[in-house]
């Protein structure tokens, strides 16, 4: 079942045509990877899904993005959308507050103020992010004192606290060491039991390890979209083969 449908999407930054007639069906409770060289449009599309491009000057979008049949730009207001679609960025970005308050920030924003309820949400979210056992005795210490890998898992917990349907991840391990990267990858695989996940990655081995489907972007176009095992073992487009075999990129 398709969770997200992207139909005939074009995006312009002024005169620059950043996304060109993008069409993708993203399945529920699967991990979909976006790969491609820098500047190919993969992060631009990710940010279009939860309307982070709204504040970009001279950004124009045509076409449709629907989430469970509702048009992201025409039927959902921004608060509804951000509750349904969580985002994790390339560089860990914990807020300058306690671990507890980082996770509770979203629920409080959406009107939850009961301490008992917030306690439950914080514990559940940190457990989902495989972080609870490491921080349960220092919840009220600053999040800025955590390691980089812990900070990124905290950012994942913060995104999960509002119980989104979709989790967007923009190169979530690119700033992390190999051990922290492995922990995040294991976590992402576990999370797909409950969430639809879209991940942008420059690491093709990572896409192979964790994703169910992969879309290859080049110069604003989706060149190929297929099951990950098929795209990497038997690409249908010569440009895909050239990219995954290292001939460019």
Curated annotation (Swiss-Prot):
<dbReference type="InterPro" id="IPR003439">
    <property type="entry name" value="ABC_transporter-like_ATP-bd"/>
</dbReference>
<dbReference type="InterPro" id="IPR003593">
    <property type="entry name" value="AAA+_ATPase"/>
</dbReference>
<keyword id="KW-1278">Translocase</keyword>
<keyword id="KW-0067">ATP-binding</keyword>
<dbReference type="GO" id="GO:0016887">
    <property type="term" value="F:ATP hydrolysis activity"/>
</dbReference>
<comment type="subunit">
    <text>The complex is composed of two ATP-binding proteins (PstB), two transmembrane proteins (PstC and PstA) and a solute-binding protein (PstS).</text>
</comment>
<keyword id="KW-0813">Transport</keyword>
<comment type="function">
    <text>Part of the ABC transporter complex PstSACB involved in phosphate import. Responsible for energy coupling to the transport system.</text>
</comment>
<dbReference type="InterPro" id="IPR005670">
    <property type="entry name" value="PstB-like"/>
</dbReference>
<protein>
    <recommendedName>
        <fullName>Phosphate import ATP-binding protein PstB 3</fullName>
        <ecNumber>7.3.2.1</ecNumber>
    </recommendedName>
</protein>
<dbReference type="Pfam" id="PF00005">
    <property type="entry name" value="ABC_tran"/>
</dbReference>
<feature type="domain" description="ABC transporter">
    <location>
        <begin position="4"/>
        <end position="244"/>
    </location>
</feature>
<keyword id="KW-1003">Cell membrane</keyword>
<feature type="binding site">
    <location>
        <begin position="36"/>
        <end position="43"/>
    </location>
    <ligand>
        <name>ATP</name>
    </ligand>
</feature>
<keyword id="KW-0592">Phosphate transport</keyword>
<dbReference type="GO" id="GO:0005524">
    <property type="term" value="F:ATP binding"/>
</dbReference>
<dbReference type="GO" id="GO:0015415">
    <property type="term" value="F:ATPase-coupled phosphate ion transmembrane transporter activity"/>
</dbReference>
<dbReference type="GO" id="GO:0035435">
    <property type="term" value="P:phosphate ion transmembrane transport"/>
</dbReference>
<dbReference type="GO" id="GO:0005886">
    <property type="term" value="C:plasma membrane"/>
</dbReference>
<dbReference type="InterPro" id="IPR027417">
    <property type="entry name" value="P-loop_NTPase"/>
</dbReference>
<dbReference type="InterPro" id="IPR017871">
    <property type="entry name" value="ABC_transporter-like_CS"/>
</dbReference>
<comment type="similarity">
    <text>Belongs to the ABC transporter superfamily. Phosphate importer (TC 3.A.1.7) family.</text>
</comment>
<keyword id="KW-0547">Nucleotide-binding</keyword>
<keyword id="KW-0472">Membrane</keyword>
């Amino acid at each position: 079942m398709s969770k997200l449908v992207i139909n005939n999407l074009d995006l312009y930054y002024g005169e620059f045509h950043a996304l060109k007639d993008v069409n993708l069906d993203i399945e529920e409770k699967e991990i979909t990877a976006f790969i491609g060289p820098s500047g190919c449009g993969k992060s631009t599309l990710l940010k279009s899904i939860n309307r982070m491009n709204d504040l970009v000057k001279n950004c124009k979008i045509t076409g449709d993005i629907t989430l469970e049949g509702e048009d992201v730009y025409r039927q959902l207001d921004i608060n509804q959308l951000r509750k349904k679609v969580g985002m994790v960025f390339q560089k860990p970005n914990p807020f300058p507050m306690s671990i507890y308050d980082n996770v509770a920030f979203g629920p409080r924003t959406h009107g939850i103020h009961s301490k008992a309820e917030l306690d439950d949400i914080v514990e559940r979210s940190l457990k989902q992010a495989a972080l609870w056992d490491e921080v349960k005795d220092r919840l009220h210490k600053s999040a800025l004192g955590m390691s980089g890998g812990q900070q990124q898992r905290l950012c994942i917990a913060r995104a999960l606290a509002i119980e989104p349907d979709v989790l967007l991840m923009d190169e979530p391990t690119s700033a992390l060491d190999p051990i922290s990267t492995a922990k995040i990858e294991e976590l992402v695989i576990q999370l797909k039991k409950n969430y639809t996940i879209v991940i942008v990655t420059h690491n093709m081995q990572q896409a192979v390890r964790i994703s169910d489907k992969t879309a290859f972007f080049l110069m604003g176009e989706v060149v190929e979209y297929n099951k990950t095992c098929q795209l990497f073992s038997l690409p249908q487009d010569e440009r895909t083969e050239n990219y995954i075999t290292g001939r460019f990129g």
